[in-house]
Amino acid sequence: MKNHLFFWGVLAIFVQAVLVTAGDEGERIVLADNKCKCVRVTSRIIPSPENPNEDILERHIRIIIPVNSRENISDPTSPVRTKFVYHLSDLCKKCDPVEVELDNQVVTASQSNICDEDSETCYAYDRNKCYTNRVPLTYGGQTKIVETALTPDSCYPD
């Protein structure tokens, strides 16, 4: 009987811990989720520890450094990358056009004024993009240069 009560007590504590953790995650707002740079920026509003009547903004910046990343990710023979540069303003910019209604007119606008067409340096593969490279293939004594997929799942349809 004691084991039965102990089991239910532990189960209740576990369920409460899971619900509290899930509740904290739900309050976070994702500001940026850049898979190319391996960065995720979130924020949430929490009560101030000094003054319970005030709220403060807490920001979480998660950066995953791909240790074996190459200078040119499409070229496996390029040297290993040793310098990683992150600009928060670049990570959080939203350049996709959005339709906004102004004075009963629908206008297309961008949420950032620093958008340019320069392709950003990627530190990891974007799994939704097809990366290829030309490599030498020797078969039957002959060497040919062939195009190969570095991310086959995104290069070939199902």
Swiss-Prot record:
Question: Where on this protein are sugars attached?
Answer: 72
Give the UniProt subcellular location, in the record's own words.
Secreted
The record lists its disulfide bonds as 36-122, 95-115, 130-155
One MF annotation (Gene Ontology) recorded for this entry: immunoglobulin receptor binding
GO biological process assignments: humoral immune response
Major localization class: secreted
| Superkingdom in the source lineage | Eukaryota
UniProtKB keywords: Disulfide bond, Glycoprotein, Secreted, Signal
- Please provide one cellular component term from the Gene Ontology annotations of this protein: pentameric IgM immunoglobulin complex
Signal peptide interval: 1-22
Q: How does it assemble?
A: Part of the secretory IgA (sIgA) complex that consists of two, four or five IgA monomers, and two additional non-Ig polypeptides, namely the JCHAIN and the secretory component (the proteolytic product of PIGR). Part of the secretory IgM (sIgM) complex that consist of five IgM monomers, and two additional non-Ig polypeptides, namely the JCHAIN and the secretory component (the proteolytic product of PIGR). JCHAIN-containing IgM interacts (via CH4 domain) with FCRM (via Ig-like domain).
Functional note: Serves to link two monomer units of either IgM or IgA. In the case of IgM, the J chain-joined dimer is a nucleating unit for the IgM pentamer, and in the case of IgA it induces dimers and/or larger polymers. It also helps to bind these immunoglobulins to secretory component.
**Protein name, entry field:** Immunoglobulin J chain
| Organism annotation | Equus asinus
